[in-house]
Design a protein with these regions (language model features):
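A short glycine-threonine-serine/GTX helix/turn-capping micro-motif
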Residues: 289-293
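Secretory targeting and sorting signals
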Residues: 2-17, 22-52
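Extracellular glycan-targeting catalytic surfaces
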Residues: 51-193, 199, 203, 222-237, ...
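Aromatic-lined glycan-binding groove of carbohydrate-active enzymes
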Residues: 216, 220
Length: 378
């Protein structure tokens, strides 16, 4: 079997210095500038009100959303979710869809500025606070990201400043260290579980970190994610199960490295791009592999996490030789397990960021934590 040349890992992640330096220069200037000049700067700066009141956007800027279409199948699908019954906020229910309905409402508001969508989204945000009580960490990990992104899209810090400052933000901060019914916190799950639990937790942790402006927390999240993708020099603290799908059982990773394979059952078994911790859910190493939907489920969290980190300035899509693109191609091309159901949003985002050249579903369904990518990135 032809081996693929493996690109060595990039250095441990650090928040991009140019933007940080630029921010420091702006703060230093603001501290000494005459008041009239400050007023002029606020008036002229694009999105000045939002920037003055809070943190950078979590996932996508207002300017980017303004360029998206308000017609076509993808828009119609998004609008349907925004207009339909969004149910009841219940973060403790790991199968709740209220978060993605809230996200849909926020996206439609951000594009159309129709106030009724923001009103509904904010009502759901208020209802969601505290509903994680009694639930497992997986439920919190799945459901939290959509609410955080929605809060950013509706500009909660300006639309409902008292709620945002006194309730929503303190609550978000508490979710990172809140002990859930399984005895774990979101941080612990992110740093210990190299499966879908951990990737969803990482996405939620990244979203909260950006929304709250927690730079150190975001850097740690990026470090853990880089380790999961395959750079054990960045992080290697995960607890793995059956290692039979690992290309190197002595150095397990979340996604097997490029060009790796193993010999079993009388044949060479390709492993490059496999998610070992989820492939084992279909059974110990064998070929053909027994089908399991867990690899795509783990990629839900990983895909959103990569996009949040990328938007924050990290080169997350390229880490470990484009690990997420390799994983998607392994599932789609090698195993012939294309994304189906609530995983169909992933190929659109992965392909948009990596040119993976994987088949794009003609329509998508939102997943556990995100969706509407055929509209956002199509």
């Amino acid at each position: 079997m032809r081996s693929i040349i493996y690109a060595p890992p990039t250095p441990s992640p650090a928040a991009p210095s140019p933007s940080s330096a630029r921010s420091r220069r702006i703060r230093n200037w603001a501290a000494t500038a005459p008041i009239p000049l400050l007023l002029i700067a606020v008036i002229l700066a694009p999105g000045a009100a939002s920037q003055a009141a809070g943190t950078p956007s979590v996932l996508i800027s207002d300017a980017a959303i303004a360029k998206l279409p308000t017609s076509g199948a993808a828009w119609t699908s998004l609008k349907k979710y925004a207009d339909s019954d969004d149910g009841t906020a219940d973060i403790a229910d790991q199968d709740s869809n209220n978060d993605v309905h809230t996200l849909a409402e926020a996206l439609v508001f951000a594009r159309t500025r129709v106030e009724s969508y923001r009103t509904r989204a904010i009502a759901n945000l208020k209802a969601a606070v505290g509903t994680e009580k009694g639930g497992r960490s997986l439920a919190l990990a799945r459901n939290l990201s959509g609410y955080v992104i929605a809060a950013d899209l509706v500009d909660l810090r300006l639309a409902a400043p008292d709620f945002d400052a006194n309730t929503f933000r303190p609550w978000l901060r508490s979710t990172l260290s809140e002990v859930m019914s399984d005895g774990k916190t979101l941080r612990q799950i992110d740093e210990q579980r190299p499966n879908n639990w951990g990737t969803h937790a990482g996405a939620a942790r990244a979203a909260v970190s950006v929304y709250l402006g927690m730079g150190s927390e975001l850097a740690r999240t990026a470090q853990v994610f880089k380790g999961w993708l395959g750079d054990r020099s960045a992080y290697a603290g995960f607890k793995y199960g059956d290692l039979s799908w690992q290309a190197n059982p002595n150095a397990p990773v979340g996604i097997d490295a490029s060009g790796t394979e193993t010999y079993a059952a009388g044949s060479d078994i390709p492993l490059g791009g496999a998610l070992p911790e989820e492939m084992r859910r279909g059974g110990t190493l064998q070929w053909p592999a027994l089908y399991t939907g867990y690899p795509w489920e783990a990629l839900q969290g990983a895909t959103l996490q990569a996009e949040i980190l990328s938007h924050a300035g990290y080169d997350s899509w390229s880490w470990s030789n484009q690990a997420l693109a390799r994983a998607a191609k392994y599932l789609t091309n090698t195993l012939k397990w294309p994304a189906i159901g609530d995983d169909t949003w992933q190929p659109w985002l992965i392909d948009a960021r990596t040119n993976a050249s994987i088949p794009l579903p003609s329509s998508t369904k939102p997943g556990k934590n995100f969706g509407f990518t055929d509209w956002l990135y199509g």
